[in-house]
Amino acid sequence: MFDKHVKTFQYGNHTVTLETGEIARQAAAAVKVSMGDTVVLVAVTTNKEVKEGQDFFPLTVDYLERTYAAGKIPGGFFKREGKQSEKEILTSRLIDRPIRPLFPEGFYHDIQIVAMVVSVDPEIDSDIPAMLGASAALVLSGVPFAGPIGAARVGYINGVYVLNPTKAELAKSQLDLVVAGTSKAVLMVESEAKILPEDVMLGAVVYGHDQMQAAINAINEFADEVNPEVWDWKAPETNEELVAKVRGIAGETIKEAFKIRQKQARSAKLDEAWNAVKEALITEETDTLAANEIKGIFKHLEADVVRSQILDGQPRIDGRDTRTVRPLNIQTGVLPRTHGSALFTRGETQALAVATLGTSRDEQIIDALSGEYTDRFMLHYNFPPYSTGEVGRVGAPKRREIGHGRLAKRALLAVLPKPEDFSYTMRVVSEITESNGSSSMASVCGGCLSLLSAGVPLKAHVAGIAMGLILEGNKFAVLTDILGDEDHLGDMDFKVAGTTEGVTALQMDIKIQGITKEIMQIALAQAKEARLHILDQMKAAVAGPQELSAHAPRLFTMKINQDKIREVIGKGGETIRSITAETGTEINIAEDGTITIAATTQEAGDAAKKRIEQITAEVEVGKVYEGTVVKILDNNVGAIVSVMPGKDGLVHISQIAHERVRNVGDYLQVGQVVNVKALEVDDRGRVRLSIKALLDAPAREENAAE
């Protein structure tokens, strides 16, 4: 019934198993990948026909996590999985990025990849198995895919690279890097690091690429065994006559356009060139396919002009050489009522970054397959359509916005203060108000500045820069601080963020095969030079953390004995509610007895802290207290005196006065304030007090007689 094929190989400390032919047999190809107890089912479906008018490659990647994989039932009212989580979106992008450049130009058939996590080992992340499964399934589907690709996670522990580290190992690692590529070249890198030098980062990329050959070889052997039917697809031939016509009509205008340094004016000139081509070559009788071909030729012509100018040593689109960073403008404290803000402008790219401080109650609760946890630092990136001068939809963040926000967040994580040193929850929002290249790296710079503006004691300043590459044969040029057009028309997008001491995040997407270790070395060195230049200007604008905003909450931390937590909370929360209401504060109590008080003023925080200290204080034997009589006991035994909130003691009738007391009521009344001395606290916490011990003893009668 099943034509099942299985391939097993060792990958670091894990055994990986690839299986096909048993599940999802109606898909073009389906592979079940097991890595330890983590199992991912990846299915590829294709469309043999191209949609009419299609002029781009419609690749869709969806990575989905099923809660049953971790033995859980979804929370919420509906009790089923809903929209994709941030982790699912980021992993979908991680699968997509190294695969997309391996499809040939002109291939416009629909391809859909669905990677579904059906079992999860909390120690083994499902992203690497999902990437390997997508690679294997594409090879088995027979589509014109220049793979397979391999994927590896690399850690760096005690100066040693670790292949596919577990979650426990990653907690000790200075690096979390995912690299993907073919047998010959690296195609994608995604990483965060704890301020590591460039050579260590490059070494990790090379190490990961070397190690992933085991996975690539296994997928090739697996495909040989399955022997899939390969598509008979040929790339459309270039219409040289049509290319010559388009060049003749628009070639010179395109060259003139790319000498214009201002983006909007340049775009207007390019529109003029395209309108001339449309008027000459596209009529009402021209079908969509032919129109798309003409449009494609025009775009190629644009790329040829930009690329050849740069490789010939001519100035770039905006007049810069290959190593110059665009002019910077840095302003902080630009929004009066926010906790921290910065406006970071680099050329025609601008980010308005705003930092907000909160308490532990504001931490984001993340219900992941591996377990629930909280996150004290959030960075959200917004890319409104007006940032590029366009009209567009405004709504929920797109995948790109989530990916860019995650990269900027990873860049800043290494310099955040420890929770014990700075117990605030932090949120940064980066509003991209202008965009012409590398808005994610502007978010890193702006995010760092806004945190400093909010008074966050960062360990160091962090800056980011985007690098580009143009490669033709043996000639290449590495570009610093790329523009949007250079990103689209170039061969690499290489983003590096870090401090003066090292790298905190690195992201690389390569559109071609053939980028060598030497080119990556040059790009990293050039990126460092640019990063240091930006850091100098950032430090000149903001040397260190500013004073806490008057509008930010003040946090006061204190530690109490765990046995006292119940007393602070009170019956049904009565005590803690009264403290928060009377002092206007917010109080959080951790299980270990750590109390965090959030207040808008120093006075309110001090008042709440004093109340808690009074509640949790112990009565000390021998100490004198000012107390209030709260009750006269029956049978003339004595009186109960409150010496501090929640702490009462007994003044026995014999401890009221030196003379014989016949009636307690003759000496004490409820509400009377008296000074008492603590005589004893027994094993059950009962307190004995004395008024008499503070009174002078009367002179003896015989002394008086003399």
UniProtKB/Swiss-Prot annotation:
EC class (word): transferase
EC number: 2.7.7.8
Gene3D superfamilies, per database record: GHMP Kinase, N-terminal domain (3.30.230.70), K Homology domain, type 1 (3.30.1370.10), Nucleic acid-binding proteins (2.40.50.140)
Domain called KH: residue spans: 553-612
Domain S1 motif: 622-692
Keyword Transferase (UniProt): yes
Keyword field: Cytoplasm, Magnesium, Metal-binding, Nucleotidyltransferase, RNA-binding, Transferase
Gene Ontology BP annotations: mRNA catabolic process; RNA processing
Compartments in which it is found: Cytoplasm
One GO location term (cellular component): cytosol
Broad class of where this protein is predominantly found: cytoplasm
Catalysed reactions, semicolon-separated: RNA(n+1) + phosphate = RNA(n) + a ribonucleoside 5'-diphosphate
Requisite cofactors: Mg(2+)
SMART domains, alphabetized: KH (SM00322), S1 (SM00316)
Matches recorded under PANTHER family: POLYRIBONUCLEOTIDE NUCLEOTIDYLTRANSFERASE (PTHR11252), POLYRIBONUCLEOTIDE NUCLEOTIDYLTRANSFERASE 1, MITOCHONDRIAL (PTHR11252:SF0)
Family that this chain belongs to: Belongs to the polyribonucleotide nucleotidyltransferase family.
Functional summary from the UniProt entry: Involved in mRNA degradation. Catalyzes the phosphorolysis of single-stranded polyribonucleotides processively in the 3'- to 5'-direction.
Name the record gives this protein: Polyribonucleotide nucleotidyltransferase
